[in-house]
């Protein structure tokens, strides 16, 4: 079975440095597994590897999607699997790097096993309680073919169909079809990098200041001047939405910096929680291990 190395972990943990060294040692080619670094024009705020870094080993899918595009995990799965196949055909090793757990689940499990969003389910049930029949109408609008196959009173299946569409952005019929056609035989070896909380928070805070020094505000200003709407998913993410508020005069500079730090720390916490649920992942605490030891440990696990 074709082996694929996955280097995952929360934002600012240090995935880039480790993955570069690993890729150099195993004839690896790095493939983006980050839902923000996949967009073009979003460089500083997403901590996308710079051009000098990309020259060290081949990088793929970074900046490959226009921010105006409605890009889903389903779209990512198709792009990433194609790229993985190309790398393997060259006799090299695919190294997936990033912190988007949903992308990893899409590759490993497809979408029939999309994790439940209990917050969303609770919200949908409240909608139905307050307005009986509304979820059926919502499903008809989102996925009319699926709605025809579910009894109007089967609230559980209606909620699940809506949930999958909201999470993935695709219809159930397309998911079933894709899963039937999915014949990839990739063997994913998953490494999750982590650090002690205080150290990770300090790295996040330092990165925020570094991004601002490197021109994050100007990057956002340029995106707006190019006509990119603030309602786009790409611009409604951490680091960008706060700068937009600052540029529009809704918050001052210090509050902008504070919000980016807090929101990034909370995001890192959610990433860690998500990765904790992935069975078979090998966790490595970078706070307790030198980079050289980490690289050797990963190589011994993978090779």
UniProtKB/Swiss-Prot annotation:
The keyword Secreted appears for this protein: no
Keywords for the protein's UniProt record, in alphabetical order: ATP-binding, Magnesium, Nucleotide-binding, Transferase, tRNA processing
Keyword Amino-acid biosynthesis recorded: no
Catalytic activity field: adenosine(37) in tRNA + dimethylallyl diphosphate = N(6)-dimethylallyladenosine(37) in tRNA + diphosphate
GO molecular function terms attached to this record: ATP binding; tRNA dimethylallyltransferase activity
Cofactor names: Mg(2+)
Residues marked Interaction with substrate tRNA (site): 100
GO biological process assignments: tRNA modification
UniProt-annotated binding residues for ATP: 9-16
Region Interaction with substrate tRNA: start-end pairs: 34-37
InterPro entries listed in its UniProt record: Dimethylallyltransferase (IPR039657), IPT (IPR018022), P-loop_NTPase (IPR027417)
Residues noted as binding substrate in the record, renumbered to the chain: 11-16
HAMAP family per record: IPP_trans (MF_00185)
Annotated family: Belongs to the IPP transferase family.
Subunit structure: Monomer.
Name this polypeptide is given: tRNA dimethylallyltransferase
Lineage: Bacteria, Thermotogati, Thermotogota, Thermotogae, Petrotogales
């Amino acid at each position: 079975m074709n082996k694929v190395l996955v280097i995952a972990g929360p934002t600012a943990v240090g995935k880039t440095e480790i993955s570069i060294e690993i890729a150099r040692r195993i004839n690896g080619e790095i493939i983006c597994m980050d839902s923000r670094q996949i967009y073009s024009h979003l460089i500083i705020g997403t901590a996308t590897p710079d051009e000098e870094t990309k020259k060290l080993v081949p990088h793929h899918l970074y900046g490959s999607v226009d921010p105006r595009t409605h890009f889903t995990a389903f779209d990512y799965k198709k792009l990433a699997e194609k790229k993985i196949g190309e790398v393997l055909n060259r006799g090299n090793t695919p190294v997936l790097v990033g912190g988007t757990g949903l992308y990893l689940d899409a590759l490993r499990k497809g979408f029939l096993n999309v994790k439940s969003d209990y917050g969303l389910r609770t919200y949908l049930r409240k909608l139905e309680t307050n307005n009986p029949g509304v979820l059926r109408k919502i499903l008809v609008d989102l996925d009319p073919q699926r709605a025809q196959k579910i009894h109007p009173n089967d609230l559980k299946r209606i909620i699940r169909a809506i949930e999958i569409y909201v999470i993935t952005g695709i219809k159930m019929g397309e998911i079933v079809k894709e899963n039937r056609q999915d014949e990839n035989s990739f063997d994913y070896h998953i490494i999750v990098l982590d650090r002690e909380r205080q150290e990770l928070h300090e790295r996040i805070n330092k990165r925020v200041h570094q991004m601002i020094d490197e021109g994050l505000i100007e990057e956002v200003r340029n995106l707006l001047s190019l006509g990119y709407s603030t309602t786009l998913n790409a611009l409604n993410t951490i680091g960008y939405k706060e700068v937009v508020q600052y540029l529009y005069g809704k918050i001052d500079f210090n509050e902008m910096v504070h919000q980016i730090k807090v929101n990034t720390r909370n995001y890192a916490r959610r990433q860690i929680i998500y990765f904790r649920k992935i069975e078979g992942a090998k966790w490595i605490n970078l706070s307790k291990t030198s980079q050289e030891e980490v690289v050797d440990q990963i190589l011994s696990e993978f090779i």
